[in-house]
Amino acid sequence: MELDLISYELDEKTKEGIEKVVEKFFTKAEPDLVLIFDKAGRILACKGMDISDTYSEFISSILSALFFASEELTSMLDKNDEMKDVFYETKNRVFLMARLEKDFLIGVISRKNLSLGSIRLFFNHLVSDLNAVLKNLKEVEKKSLKISKEELKKKLDQILGS
């Protein structure tokens, strides 16, 4: 079994760039939550609802799964089609997800306090601006850790006290 380890380095300049772009989006769209995360659900940035790290990671993992399931469905229907973003709405909220540079994803959850057209327009600008910031993100050599399932189970049992 190989464990995927983080393959990017988030420097201060990039962090500040992300924060600035997200703050600009917040003043326009007033969303409930903005999450920027990698494809494994690890969070780069989180702004909005006052939620625990565990809960935000849980949300980002679900959003990641939704995005990639939608991407797979798109590919099954037409190999030449390309996933742009995922948009869906509930009675009270709007959910938007898109792929960013360097295999990052963004998820936005918003109450329906703006027109859907405005939310989508602001979201498209957000994605474009974040891509400009993330384009310069330093990638580091990806390391993989090989470990047997038995050894992993043993380590987890030690950590969890089982």
Curated annotation (Swiss-Prot):
<dbReference type="GO" id="GO:0032008">
    <property type="term" value="P:positive regulation of TOR signaling"/>
</dbReference>
<dbReference type="InterPro" id="IPR004942">
    <property type="entry name" value="Roadblock/LAMTOR2_dom"/>
</dbReference>
<feature type="coiled-coil region">
    <location>
        <begin position="129"/>
        <end position="161"/>
    </location>
</feature>
<dbReference type="GO" id="GO:0071230">
    <property type="term" value="P:cellular response to amino acid stimulus"/>
</dbReference>
<dbReference type="GO" id="GO:0005085">
    <property type="term" value="F:guanyl-nucleotide exchange factor activity"/>
</dbReference>
<dbReference type="GO" id="GO:0060090">
    <property type="term" value="F:molecular adaptor activity"/>
</dbReference>
<dbReference type="InterPro" id="IPR037587">
    <property type="entry name" value="LAMTOR2-like"/>
</dbReference>
<keyword id="KW-0175">Coiled coil</keyword>
<protein>
    <recommendedName>
        <fullName>Uncharacterized protein aq_1822</fullName>
    </recommendedName>
</protein>
<dbReference type="Pfam" id="PF03259">
    <property type="entry name" value="Robl_LC7"/>
</dbReference>
